[in-house]
């Protein structure tokens, strides 16, 4: 199969939405029956985002095969059916690490290692390997044109266009077209300068996606086309919208998919966007609004919980409910008490690391349990629920996780020292292992217990969900917890690790060690989130029993 490439770059400012724009184009092309994949190239020196601060970088998205990747891969999976893998995201750090490994091994036969050709060749090889077996590969380069760290990536995609042929490659550039109220018009000069910068490194864009807070007039688009040497029909106006799921229709209406197919010589049926039309309809026509409290420690940057936010919205669509997320700092719960949690229809405690705010999360789980508020715990959210139950129901007053208190006499949560990874290999860890790349990662099999809420929600005896954790329930203390009423409703494939717990005498209290948010999509939703938001609606109406 011959693969065609669309390279996506950004200019003027960061955070223009390259990932959303690229994913929206991919969704349209997929709707035309084409096999599409996507890649994200990140110019930073970290090997992967696994150890980066969520408040700087946003969430770490975990793929089925256990790669810790950029949050844009979450957008890709929410817009297209293709599942991302470790091949779909790599960083400058990963590239340099591999080149240096090859140099130490002697693979370069004593050559002087340079950015060109060694670094650029490594980038090209990874792009080609990650795109095999697809009609179109859309490759997004992180950062902004002109950034010094992105230059090797820009040079690599320039070379790829030469090697693969311009008939098989396209460049799509996102740029800002600001509106100046004082002048009463949009200004195209920033776009012109951004394209000039791109052309100075040998890349002529074929498509310009022009971001603005309004529709860009036809005469301004013609002006951009003239000065940037781009066909007028390839200058796409992408205005701000109230839902990212409207963007596929927005750019299809301007014929971008037709332009791409014609350029690549691809004959494909018209895109069927009925599923996206249904998503937009459900989003625009909720029957009620529920308020869900998300109690976390990274709330100053909502993107730290991007997939959770989106999964809640998806579940709202399936229940015809608008979901209002109230972000609550777990440290505020510690300082101000339960008053921070009053008036919520449901409570969600997401994943996280470190001891800051941990007691606030434990108290949150207590409040939800005692007041019969629907509760969904994810990863750490399950562990704090377990700690709270052990302390206040099972009578283990000093129960804790060894992550936060290594000296606790009742470690209900401890470090996993051995497990089988997603490829079937045995992994071993100790307290002294590196932080990066040392967690239980990727899709894992989970067996669900008959008669449990989890089994009812999923409708299956076994499921696969994605993990990202290094601490797990201590099986030695499970008998005491189960005797006190704790329900274990999900176990790992070898039945050694607890995956899901449920609380007794509670209408809806489910907590999972895995991350269900990573597999939720706007078209399909996710059973755990759908059940959770449904329970929130019942709580709102006073119907939850």
Swiss-Prot record:
One of its GO terms (cellular component) is cytosol. CTPSs have evolved a hybrid strategy for distinguishing between UTP and CTP. The overlapping regions of the product feedback inhibitory and substrate sites recognize a common feature in both compounds, the triphosphate moiety. To differentiate isosteric substrate and product pyrimidine rings, an additional pocket far from the expected kinase/ligase catalytic site, specifically recognizes the cytosine and ribose portions of the product inhibitor. It comes from the Bacteria. Its EC number is 6.3.4.2. This is CTP synthase. The keyword Membrane does not apply. UTP binds at residues 14, 187-192, 223. Allosterically activated by GTP, when glutamine is the substrate; GTP has no effect on the reaction when ammonia is the substrate. The allosteric effector GTP functions by stabilizing the protein conformation that binds the tetrahedral intermediate(s) formed during glutamine hydrolysis. Inhibited by the product CTP, via allosteric rather than competitive inhibition. Mg(2+) binds at residues 72, 140. CTP binds at residues 14, 147-149, 187-192, 223. Residues 1-266 are annotated as: Amidoligase domain. Keywords: ATP-binding, Glutamine amidotransferase, Ligase, Magnesium, Metal-binding, Nucleotide-binding, Pyrimidine biosynthesis. Gene3D superfamilies: 3.40.50.880, P-loop containing nucleotide triphosphate hydrolases. Belongs to the CTP synthase family. ATP binds at residues 15-20, 72, 239-241. Catalyzes the ATP-dependent amination of UTP to CTP with either L-glutamine or ammonia as the source of nitrogen. Regulates intracellular CTP levels through interactions with the four ribonucleotide triphosphates. Residues 291-542 form the Glutamine amidotransferase type-1 domain. It comes from Photobacterium profundum (strain SS9). PANTHER family: CTP SYNTHASE (PTHR11550), CTP SYNTHASE-RELATED (PTHR11550:SF0). Homotetramer. GO terms for molecular function: ATP binding; CTP synthase activity; glutaminase activity; identical protein binding; metal ion binding. The gene is pyrG.
């Amino acid at each position: 199969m011959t693969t065609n490439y669309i390279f996506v770059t950004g200019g003027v400012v960061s955070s223009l939405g390259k990932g959303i724009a690229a994913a929206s184009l991919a969704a349209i092309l997929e709707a035309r029956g084409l096999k599409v994949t996507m890649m994200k190239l990140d110019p930073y020196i970290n090997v992967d985002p696994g150890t980066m601060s969520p408040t700087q970088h946003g969430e770490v998205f975990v793929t089925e095969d256990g790669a810790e990747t950029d949050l844009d891969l979450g957008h890709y999976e929410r817009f297209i059916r293709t599942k991302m893998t470790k091949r779909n995201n790599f960083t400058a750090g990963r590239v340099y690490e591999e080149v240096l490994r090859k140099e130490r091994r002697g693979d370069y036969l004593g050559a002087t290692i340079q950015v060109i050709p060694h670094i650029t060749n490594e980038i090209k090889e990874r792009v080609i390997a990650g795109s095999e077996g697809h009609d179109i590969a859309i490759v997004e380069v992180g950062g902004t044109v002109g950034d010094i760290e992105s230059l090797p990536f820009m040079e690599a995609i320039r070379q790829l266009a030469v090697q693969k042929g311009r008939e098989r490659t396209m460049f799509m550039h996102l740029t800002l077209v600001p509106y100046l109220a004082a002048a009463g018009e949009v200004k195209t000069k920033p776009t012109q300068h951004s394209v000039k910068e791109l052309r100075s490194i040998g890349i002529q864009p074929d498509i310009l996606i022009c971001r603005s807070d309004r529709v860009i007039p036809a005469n301004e688009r013609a002006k951009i086309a003239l000065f940037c040497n781009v066909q007028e029909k390839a200058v796409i106006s992408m205005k701000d919208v109230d839902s990212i799921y409207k963007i596929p229709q927005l750019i299809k209406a301007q014929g971008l998919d037709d332009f791409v197919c014609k350029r690549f010589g691809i004959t494909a049926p018209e895109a069927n966007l009925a599923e996206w039309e249904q998503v937009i309809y459900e989003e625009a026509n909720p029957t009620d609004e529920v308020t869900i409290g998300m109690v976390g420690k990274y709330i100053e940057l909502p993107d730290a919980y991007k997939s959770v936010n989106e999964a809640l919205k998806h579940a709202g669509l399936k229940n015809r409910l608008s979901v209002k997320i109230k972000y609550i700092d777990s440290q505020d719960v510690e300082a101000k008490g339960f008053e921070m949690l009053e008036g919520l229809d449901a409570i969600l405690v997401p994943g996280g690391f470190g001891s800051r705010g941990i007691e606030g999360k434990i108290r949150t789980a207590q409040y939800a349990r005692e007041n019969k508020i629907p509760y969904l715990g994810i990863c750490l959210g399950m562990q704090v629920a377990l700690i709270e139950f052990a302390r206040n129901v099972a009578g283990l007053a000093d129960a804790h996780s060894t992550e936060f208190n290594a000296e606790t006499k009742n470690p209900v949560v401890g470090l996993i020292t051995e497990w089988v990874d997603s490829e079937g290999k045995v992994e071993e860890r100790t307290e002294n292992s590196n932080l990066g790349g040392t967690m239980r990662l990727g899709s894992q099999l989970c067996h669900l217990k008959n008669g449990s809420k989890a089994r009812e929600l999923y409708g299956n005896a076994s499921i696969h969900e994605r993990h990202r954790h290094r601490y797990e329930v201590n099986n030695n203390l499970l008998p005491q917890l189960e005797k006190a009423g704790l329900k274990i409703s999900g176990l790992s494939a070898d039945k050694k690790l607890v995956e899901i717990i449920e609380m007794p005498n509670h209408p809806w209290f489910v907590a999972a060690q895995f991350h269900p948010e990573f597999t939720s999509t706007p078209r399909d939703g996710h059973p755990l989130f759908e059940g959770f938001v449904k329970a929130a609606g019942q709580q709102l109406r006073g119907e939850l029993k």
